[in-house]
Amino acid sequence: YLSRRFLAQITRHQNEVKYMSASLQYSDYSGVEDFVIPYDLMGTGQEKEYLKQCSSSMKNYEELVKAGVDNNSAGYCASQGMRNILLISATPYQWKHMIRQRVCRRNTKETRYVMLKIWEQLISQNGELFSDCGPFCMNGGCEEGKMTCGKCIPPKMSPTDIIRVDFPKLCEETILEEGEADEDSTD
């Protein structure tokens, strides 16, 4: 699940890309309490306050729906941190293009992390085709001009290596991937 903020960013890519997402326009999100915690809030002690604010937004949404306001109008109350399901279909060329742009250190951390995870998966499917997907700084030089971050990612770093360097808080704990059993789900 991704945040609605990620959805707003990634859907800027329109050529040879298709998206299917849950919709605030048609679906009733009353009772939803599932939010992405921004990376820079992790470990700050501010997580509970952030989640409280997100929850408050969704309670306002729910009250509007109960009062007869349509889902679309009530959706303006929804937090950008609300988790959202998103399916993306793209040509290999577009995946490479999106990854090059979106794993750049100038992007939001959630966008970078999600695109690095997608890059990991694409490499596992076809390493030859997707091994050179890194940001422009890894493949010759930054194209941001005076807007450069000044922190080039070394060539030959894998997406897994970049995650370890740039997202250490997410590497500190074991995160169960879909399909893996935890102690509560084994017989």
Q: Model-flagged regions — what are they?
A:
Residues Y1-D187:
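Family-specific signature for flavin-dependent thymidylate synthase
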